[in-house]
Every structure is written in C-alpha cells, then in structure tokens.
C-alpha cells in the first residue's frame, strides 16, 4: 500500500544502519519462526492503539523489507524498537485501512491482539455491508 501511494521501502532492512534484522531464521521450526520476535510501540490514540488498548505488544518478524518513506496520506500506527514502521493506516479513510508488517494470522486464536484486530476488521466489514442495498 505504501509503495502504491508513493512511499518507498528499504529493500534489506538488516543492511540499514540502526535497524536490526527483521528476517526469520529459516533453520528454526515454523512455531519458532512465527513466534514473538520483538515488541512494537503503538501510537497513542491511533487506530491500532484504539483496537488493542495497550501501549506496546509483541509481534513476530519475518520480513526483509520495511517502510523507508511513508507515502503522503498515510499515518504511522506502530514502530519497532529500532524505529522501523511496523503498522500504518490511511489518514481520514472512510473504512478500515490498517496495514501491518507482521503476521497476525499466525495462530490467531492464541493471540488476543490478533483477535482484536481481526474482530475490528470484521466489525468494519459488517458496518460497510449494512450501508449497501441488498438485491431484491
């Protein structure tokens, strides 16, 4: 979404001074690869903070690329401990437009933060659907 709207990426975050390696270790099993890798700080009052209700949460980390410059119209929702953008949304969007860098779908039923995110997405889908006419 960031690139499509005019933003840019770091192609190899691990090679950027000041950033740690966000890639998974392929020698580990899937549970370990997708396990919590680091914490992210949620922007107070932001969409993600309102959904989760906490200042920070642990997330998995399996990515080599990362946001470099955020596109105009996007808002940072969370950052990693090294300052890398881990989540963003579209400012003043009429619907649910949250992008995250981690994999909240992994073992979702065991992760209350992921459950809250997907619950908010589902509620937004239902709200959108309720505004549309149904075929007769």
Model-derived regions: residue spans:
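Post-Walker A helix-loop "phosphate-sensing" segment adjacent to the P-loop in P-loop NTPases
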Residues: 6-11
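Amide-donor transfer/coupling interface in amidating biosynthetic enzymes
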Residues: 14, 18-136
């Amino acid at each position: 979404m960031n690139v499509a709207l005019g933003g840019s990426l770091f192609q190899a975050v691990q090679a950027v001074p000041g950033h740690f390696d966000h890639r998974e270790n392929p020698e580990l099993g899937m549970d370990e690869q997708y396990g919590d890798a680091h914490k992210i700080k949620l922007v107070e009052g932001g969409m993600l903070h309102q959904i989760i209700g906490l200042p920070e949460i642990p997330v998995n980390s399996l990515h080599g690329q990362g946001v470099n410059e955020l596109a105009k119209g996007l808002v940072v929702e969370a950052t990693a401990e090294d300052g890398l953008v881990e989540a963003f949304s579209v400012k003043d969007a009429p619907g649910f437009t949250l992008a995250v860098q981690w994999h909240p779908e992994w073992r979702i039923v065991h992760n209350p933060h992921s459950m809250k995110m997907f619950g908010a997405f589902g509620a937004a889908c239902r709200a959108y659907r309720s505004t549309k006419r149904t075929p007769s």
